[in-house]
A protein has these predicted regions:
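Insoluble glucan recognition modules
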Residues: 428-537
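C-terminal outer-membrane/trafficking sorting elements
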Residues: 534-578
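C-terminal segment of classical bacterial N-terminal signal peptides
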Residues: 13-24
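A conserved helix-loop-beta module that forms one wall/lid of the active-site cleft
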Residues: 138-169
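Middle-to-C-terminal accessory/interaction subdomains
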Residues: 45, 56-58, 89, 100, ...
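Internal "kinase-insert"/substrate-recognition segments embedded within catalytic cores
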Residues: 116-118, 127, 132-134, 154-159, ...
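Conserved NTP-binding catalytic cores of kinases and kinase-like/nucleotidyltransferase enzymes
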Residues: 26-145
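Positively charged n-region of N-terminal signal peptides that target proteins for export
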Residues: 1-4
């Protein structure tokens, strides 16, 4: 049965939402090509202009090319410009990634600025990635979902990403995501930076930043797992190891492996591996069904000190997620060897930690994620259409973000339900939140009216800031009638029927035109498609319903069903008292 996904009035993450709000606020009409037929930026997002010396193309991942850049906010006053066409700033650029570099014409890049810069509102740094996400068929939402969950589960640090359009050497390259790189830094992975070739016993205990890797091309150490498979650890910090450092890292990973494959009732493992961060990290991989996690792009870090533990994180690559309905753990029955994940899942203490964290973080999680993704899609949809046009000859792009949004939201709803069932966590009663956004001053009689098959009809009044209404019900279906406060006895809104409500649902009432006189203006519930506002009030004292489905309204104290051709049926008389 089709599920309605609706906007939440809950606050989104302050670190992410402003970029989306500004992008949609300054959206312009799509202009795909210029007069000479060349595809141009959409004008709805900031544009990063990069020019290499002599226009040399970026062809490898090993050698930085000298270049310049400037960032044009495209009229968005919330974003700081860096450089200009006349006075660009110095930059170095090279390729990055593995499959995403080899498999697609739309390439990802690594940037190294000449000096630290707080690009697109992110923490100032010299090091950023430009991720192309050419391998993401789900509306560029894979990393967006993974990073959202990481922040929600409060992992110590989560990379930030911001949408931007890229013009490289005068060629429009489409929609990219400027992303913070995983590095040892006070604003990223905040641990002591261990020097290369260190030999001192105390110093080689940390800090360490390593990656469980599925490629053996980078400097690494390798051990044989308890199941006979080889596991590779690429070290990021330090970058060049002494004999002592190599021995320390190898011994540490070997000890973890021995304990992970050892007695599942023992608690000794948790003396060396942080169980809280592991559980938070694990939940992100499980909910997104990231079957490549614990196989590649899987980071661990350790602070300096003999008593310090290893921590899983930060999250990074979600390029294989959100594909099919969630029916099994991410580490079972997959093509990749997920190293330690299956063994870790067998520890009762770890399962208890997963359940405790899920009980803590799952309420309203999916409702908030729905709202976040809605804002995300609205911010990039015009640029995504340009991107799809730019790369259509290559057979990739995301031209239908609304369809992608439906898929991702459905996937995450199903995954959350699957996780609740697996951990034995009973979801809370669904809460229906009604939010008004009037254009003019409304009276205190603004309200909503709810009723169902097994509940008595009642009014719902404000509980927060005078504009937010909350009503909790398990009655299915539940009907909601939104009532205009100024003219509440003579006009109202359409009714929404909710089927199979299992999550918190939120409805936002939009005033499309000023309500300067009775029976004028448009009011509707903003739901998933959000594309049409139906006007039921264009004839004085006679409601006109042009929809195929009857609409319930409040008129002169009576609850009416408005049929086609302006006929109605009286359901009953209502009082303005609760």
């Amino acid at each position: 049965m089709k599920r309605l996904f609706l906007l939440s009035c809950c606050a989104l993450f302050a670190l992410t939402l402003p970029a989306f709000e500004s992008a949609s606020t300054h959206a312009q009409t799509l202009n795909v090509t210029s007069s000479n037929g060349q595809i141009e930026p959409s004008g709805t997002l900031p544009v990063l202009f990069v020019n290499t010396d002599n226009g040399v193309d970026v062809v490898d991942k090993e050698t930085y090319l000298t270049a310049t850049y400037y960032l044009d906010p495209m009229g968005d006053t919330t974003i700081t410009a860096f450089g200009s066409k006349e006075t660009p700033l110095p930059l170095q650029i090279k390729g990055r990634g593995n499959w995403t570099w080899r498999g697609f014409e739309k390439k990802p890049y690594r940037l190294k600025l000449d000096g630290k810069a707080a690009l697109l509102g992110m923490k100032a740094s010299k090091h950023f990635a430009l991720l192309a996400h050419a391998d993401d068929p789900h509306g560029f939402m894979r990393n967006a979902v993974g990073f959202f969950l990481s922040e929600r589960f409060e992992l110590p640090w989560t990379p930030k990403q911001r949408p931007v359009e890229l013009v490289l050497n005068g060629d429009y390259r489409g929609l990219y995501f400027l992303t913070e790189l995983i590095r040892v830094d006070k604003d990223r992975v905040s641990i002591t930076e261990q020097p290369d070739l260190c030999i001192h016993a105390d110093s080689i205990t940390g800090g360490w930043l390593v990656e469980i890797d599925n490629y053996d091309t980078d400097p690494h150490v390798a051990i044989t797992e308890g199941d006979g498979e080889t596991i590779i650890f690429t070290y990021k910090t330090p970058e060049v190891l002494s004999t002592e450092q190599t021995r320390f890292l190898t011994d540490e990973m070997s000890r973890l492996d021995s304990l992970i494959y050892g007695d599942k009732q023992s608690i000794e493992l948790w003396q060396y591996l942080d169980i809280d961060d592991l559980a938070r990290f694990f939940l992100v991989q499980e909910l997104t069904d990231n079957y490549e996690s614990f196989h590649g792009s899987c980071y661990l870090y350790r602070e300096m000190g003999a008593a310090e533990k290893w921590h899983f994180g930060p999250v990074w690559d979600f390029g294989s997620t959100l594909n099919h309905s969630k029916t099994q753990p991410f580490y079972e029955g997959r093509e990749h060897h997920n190293t330690w994940a299956p063994q870790l899942a067998l520890f009762p203490a770890f399962q208890d930690k997963l359940k405790a964290l899920w009980e803590l973080y799952s309420p309203n999680l999916i409702t908030d994620l729905d709202a976040y993704l809605q804002a995300f899609v609205e911010s990039i949809e015009t640029a995504a259409a340009n991107d799809a046009e730019r790369w259509k000859t290559q057979g990739y792009g995301n031209a239908d973000l609304e369809q992608d949004l439906v898929h991702v939201q459905q996937f995450m709803h199903d995954a959350a339900l699957w996780e609740s069932n697996r951990l034995g966590v009973t979801p809370p009663e669904p809460t229906i939140t009604i939010r008004w956004r009037p254009l003019n001053e409304w009276t205190d009689k603004q309200m909503a009216f709810v009723w169902g098959e097994s509940i008595e009809a009642r009014f719902v009044k404000p509980v927060q800031d005078g504009d937010c209404y909350t009503y909790t019900s398990t009655d299915i279906p539940l009907n909601i009638l939104f009532v205009n406060g100024t003219y509440w006895t003579t006009r109202g809104n359409q009714t929404v029927d909710i089927n199979n409500l299992t999550e918190d649902a939120c409805f936002e009432v939009l005033a499309d035109t000023a309500t300067t006189a009775p029976h004028t203006g448009k009011h509707a519930v903003k739901a998933l498609d959000c594309s049409t506002l139906t006007d039921h009030f264009n004839t004085p004292y006679l409601y006109n319903n042009t929809e195929a489905t009857p609409v319930k309204v409040l008129h002169n104290g009576q609850l009416l069903i408005i049929h086609n051709q302006r006929t109605y049926t009286v359901l009953g008389t209502l009082s303005d008292e609760e």
